[in-house]
Amino acid sequence: MRSKIWLATAAVVTVAVATSAVAIAADTQVNTYKVEGSIKGGKGATAKAPKPVAVEFNYYVGEKNGLRPSPVTDYSILFGGLKVNTSDFPGCDVDKLTAAGDPSVCPKGSIMGSGRVINEVGQPSNLNDKSLYCYLELTTINSTKKNHFLLFLKGVQSAPDPKKTCVTQVAEPIDAKFVKRNGGTSLDFTVPQNLLHPASLDNAVTNVQSKLKNQSKKSKGKKVSFFESTSCKSTQKISVTFTQESDGSKQTASTPTKCTK
C-alpha cells in the first residue's frame, strides 16, 4: 500500500515539475535573426582606389516558440569592405532635428537613404500578446558630428493605409555612430527606452528594410562618395549583432555580399 502511495505521489510531482518546466520555457523569449543585403557597385575597389557603392539591407527578428520577440536594445551593423566619408557631406544637427520632429529642417545633401521598421507591440506581462502594431518610416541622415549618423523614425496613429500606422506617435532620431572595424565599418547604436517601451508596452522590432544611396560629390578636387568600397573579397558580409533585452544575450546574423559593376 505504501508503495502505491509513494508511486502515485511521485507521479504527481513529476507531472507538476514537467508542467512547470513547460510554463517556464513558454515564458522565455528566444529571439531568432535573419539578415539579407546587397552592395551595388565597388567592383575592383582597393584601399588606394575606393569606389562608390549603394547598400541595401534587411533584417528579420522572430521568436523560437512563437512568442512576441524580446525588444533589442543594441545593434552593431558591420559592412564588410566599406568605409564612410561623413565629413565630406552636409550634416544635420541632431538637436535641431529632434526639436522640429521632421527631416525637412536638414540641409540639402544630408539625407542618405530611407526605409521602414515594423514592430509587434504588447503587454510586458503577456509574451503571447501581439495585439498592437507599429509601422515606422526610416530616414537616414548624415550628422554634423563626425562619423555620426541619424536614424530618424516617424510613426503616425492614423493613415489611409492601416498597415502604415503606429500605436503611438513617433518623431525622433536615434544618434548612431560609424566605427572603423577590422575588415570594414560598423554602424552602432542603442535604442532609447521610450522607443523600446512606449506607453509602458514592449515594442519588438520584427523587420527593418533600409536603402543607403550612392551619394557622391567633389571634395578637394576629387570625387568622393559617402559609402565607398575598399575591397571586394569573396568572404565579405553584412553582419548584424543584436543584443536582446530580456537576458542581455548577443547573437550575430550575416549575409554574404559581392561587389558589382
Language-model regions, residue ranges each:
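Ser/Thr/Pro/Gly-rich, low-complexity intrinsically disordered stalk/linker tracts of secreted
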Residues: 24-261
